[in-house]
Amino acid sequence: MTLDLSLLPDGGASWLDASGDHADIVLSTRIRLARNVDGYAFTGRARDGERLRVLAQLRDAVPNVPSLARSVLLRVDEMPSTDRLLLHERHLVSKELAGLDAQHPVRSGAAVFLADDVGVMVNEEDHLRLQALRSGFEPAAAYAAVERLDRELGGRVPFAFHPEFGFLTACPTNTGTGMRASVLIHLPGLVLTKEIAKVLSGLQQMGLTYRGLYGEGSEVVGNFFQISNQTTLGRSEDELLDHLMRVVRHVIEREEEARRVLLRDAGYIIEDKLWRAYGTLRYARSLSFDEAMNYLSGVRLAVGLKLISGLSVYTLNKLLIFSQSAHLAYAEGRTLTDSEAGVARARFVRQALATEGGSQG
């Protein structure tokens, strides 16, 4: 592995610090703006030379963009697959930019600029994906950061824009504002009370969609759902953001009510189930990714319900991300087999819980 995480601002993991609102329920908020450079074919139709020129144009502009003044450029197209996977696991690049499946091989010119609180993916589905990632439920702060970046970068790079349709994008659902606002939210209460289907159906009726831990194409694991807007055309950024905020606040309220119902109607059963999850994590010698996510979901719920004390949400956030396969390989300094990763994952979790152990709340 060649990636040096010490070069990244805060290791690219400041969004894990549990500092935002409702951090026990909402892991993170992301605002992303899709932009294309005028005069070039969209990334999927562009030749290698065009994509490299897009990257060169952005690289030339960066010194004059205050939001990116201290950014680090990572050439994703020159990285080994494990490094690309690590960036994806850390939510710094998309699966498509990282080229992690046969449908989306890594493209020439694929890169990412990472700054303190914003980033720009280059040559993903669109030429540029501007993004801000925040801890907890912080859509206003995330939007303010990415809007500032958009304004600064737009003054240096000509974006493809149509007076009637707005910002032009490779996928028609992004045309208009080009904005995708998403919240990664933990909903075990609604799952356990079997209310989750109603909530998810309601999201779709209100023009929102849900996905798994890593967005489009990913499965729901550990009771984490990514809620986001579906389309952008015909609505302003403020309207899209306000709608998402109102709906997510309602979902948070529903989750909090479900947790109260669980404690009231099945207190001992739930407490036993969650402490069993903690015990497994504390002493298991091998854990698959899905096992770890599901047990961590239980412990996270227990911490939220104050059944377990002395264990921070920040630690749980780190366990969620850093116990994935590429992070384990990075820590070990070599590629791991599935069985080796299971052993390394269990050891990593045990050590973290031994350092910051939970006690009865």
Regions of interest found by a model, annotated:
Residues 166-183:
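Conserved phosphate/anionic-ligand binding catalytic regions in large, soluble enzymes, centered on
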Residues 186-189, 195:
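Structural signature of FAD isoalloxazine-binding scaffolds in flavoprotein oxidoreductases
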Residues 1-164, 179, 193, 198-361:
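Long, Pro/Ser/Thr-rich low-complexity/intrinsically disordered regulatory tracts in eukaryotic proteins
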